[in-house]
Amino acid sequence: DMMSSMPKGLTASTGMDALTHAIEAYIGRSTTKQTRAASIEAIQLIFDNLQTAYKNGNDKTARRNMLRASYLAGTAFTKSYVGYVHAVAHSLGGCYGIPHGLANSVLLPIVLKAYGTAAHKKLARLARITGISDSKLDAVAAEEFINHIRSMNISMNIPEPLDGIRNEDIPKLACYADKEANPLYPVPALWGPEKLEQMYHLVQEVSEHDRNRNSEHPGKAA
C-alpha cells in the first residue's frame, strides 16, 4: 500500500515533522489539558515506532501507530500552534525549496537547545514521561531529551547540515521567520531577528561528529 512503499527518507522526515508538531505544541504558552495529552501520546508513539517504520516499511503496526501519532500531533498544534522551528523551516522551504520535514528534523534539536532554561521544565517533563530520562534535574533531563532527538536523526541518516543556505540571505530569512512567529506563535521565549539569524548559521555548521558520520555513511537516505 501507499504507506509501505514510502521511501525511507520520506518516512524519517515526515515522522520527525509530526514530532516537531507535538513538541512545539506542548512547550508553547497556549496549551490546554487536551492538547498536552495529545502531544504526549504522539511523542511516545513516535519514539516507539518511527525508527521501526524506517527500518521496515512493511511493519503495519508501526505504520498504523505513526498515522495515529501524526493525527494527534495535528490536533495539538492546530489549537496550540507551533514555534520557531516551523518559522525558520518555512523560510528555508520558501527560499531554497528545502523539504519541510527535513528542515524541521534538523532544526528541532537546535532550536530546543537554544530556548535554554525557558523550555527546560517542559522538556524535562516530556523526557521523564517518555522514559528518556529519570534525572530530577530539569536541565539534565531536557538535555537528554534533545540528545535523543539528535540520535533519532542520526539513526535515520537525516542529512546535516542543510545545504545551500547563503550568508547574504540570512538577514532576510530571519525577518521572514520573525514576522511569521511574532506575535502569532506562543513560543517559550521571544526572539528577535538577530537571535533567529543564529539558527540559520547553526544549520550550516558541520561538527567533527557530523564529519566523521558523513565519512562513514556517505550516502543520504533514499
Label each residue range with its predicted role:
Residues 46, 50, 73, 126, ...:
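Hydrophobic alpha-helical packing residues
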Residues 37-41, 45, 65-68, 87-90, ...:
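Amphipathic alpha-helical interaction segments
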Residues 1-80:
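Carboxylate- and glycine-rich phosphate/diphosphate-binding segment that chelates Mg2+/Mn2+
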Residues 123, 133-222:
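C-terminal charged capping/lid subdomain of soluble metabolic enzymes
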Residues 7-8, 30-37, 109-111, 134-135, ...:
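A ubiquitous short alpha-helical element
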Residues 16, 20, 40-43, 47, ...:
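Hydrophobic faces of stable alpha-helices that mediate helix-helix packing
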Residues 80-150:
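C-terminal catalytic subdomain
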